């Protein structure tokens, strides 16, 4: 009988870990929301020997590419966009 509550607790923790945070209340000012917004960056590395569609687009093999909310910084240049969790990011290589 102790396994059922233990299983339920594990299931609840798993669901809570996968859940997305609730959106902020609409009464926050835009300036405060801009200050609290964090920059999301996803780092992607390509180490393939064969030609890929990304390589044809300019992302060569072994080149480090990132998806960021900001503009591309030197030495990166913009090659397109990334979509992750329904958000659009800048694809820089």
Curated annotation (Swiss-Prot):
It is found in: Secreted. Has antibiotic, anti-fungi and antiviral activity. One of its GO terms (cellular component) is extracellular matrix. Disulfide bonds join 65-93, 67-82, 72-92. Residues 20-62 form a propeptide. One of its GO terms (biological process) is disruption of plasma membrane integrity in another organism. Belongs to the alpha-defensin family. This is Neutrophil cationic peptide 1 type A. SMART domains: Defensin_propep, DEFSN. Its main location: secreted. The keyword Disulfide bond applies. It comes from the Eukaryota. It holds the Pfam family Defensin_1. Residues 1-19 form the signal peptide. Keywords: Antibiotic, Antimicrobial, Antiviral defense, Defensin, Disulfide bond, Fungicide, Secreted, Signal.
């Amino acid at each position: 009988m102790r396994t059922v509550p233990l299983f339920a607790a594990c299931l609840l923790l798993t669901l809570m870990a996968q859940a997305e945070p609730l959106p902020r209340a609409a009464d926050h000012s835009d300036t405060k929301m801009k200050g609290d917004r964090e920059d999301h960056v996803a780092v992607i590395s390509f180490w393939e020997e064969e030609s890929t569609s990304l390589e044809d687009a300019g992302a060569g093999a072994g080149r480090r590419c990132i998806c960021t909310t900001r503009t591309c910084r030197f030495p990166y240049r913009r090659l397109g966009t990334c979509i992750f969790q329904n958000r659009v990011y800048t694809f820089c290589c």
